[in-house]
Amino acid sequence: MAAITFHLDVVSAEKKLFSGRAESVQVSGSEGELGIHAGHTPLLTAITPGMVRIIKQHGEEEIIYLSGGMLEVQPSTVTVLTDTAIRGEDLDAAKAAEAKRQAEEQIRNQHGDIDFAQAASDLAKAIAQLRVIELTKKSR
């Protein structure tokens, strides 16, 4: 028996990264992890830097890094809007690790001209990218 699906769009400021049928989607919401399946109650919520894990129509998994954004759930359509979205296999582990190191350094060595909130945001994004890279490697 075929799984019940819904239409999913993952759209960044630059391009549409995914548009198709999905069995489920998992994102990091502002209130915690969200799992969306067909028939989910309509919802509009902020999403935090992290990933969107898509289970496509025939069970294939795709993981995409998101810099944060919005998630909208309608009866037959789910839309993820984000400033930055990068497929897990396209992320650069060395670059993400360096960004994490730099953000940690900025937080440790705070001076008047360093914006703590920006450094914390950069750290969260780098950690999220490293997590997506790790999960992408495991799913191959």
Curated annotation (Swiss-Prot):
This is ATP synthase epsilon chain 1. The lineage of its organism: Bacteria, Pseudomonadati, Pseudomonadota, Gammaproteobacteria, Vibrionales. PANTHER family: ATP SYNTHASE DELTA/EPSILON CHAIN, ATP SYNTHASE EPSILON CHAIN, CHLOROPLASTIC. Produces ATP from ADP in the presence of a proton gradient across the membrane. Keywords: ATP synthesis, Cell inner membrane, Cell membrane, CF(1), Hydrogen ion transport, Ion transport, Membrane, Transport. GO terms for cellular component: plasma membrane; proton-transporting ATP synthase complex. It holds the Pfam family ATP-synt_DE. It comes from Photobacterium profundum (strain SS9). It is found in: Cell inner membrane. It is a peripheral membrane protein. The gene is atpC1.
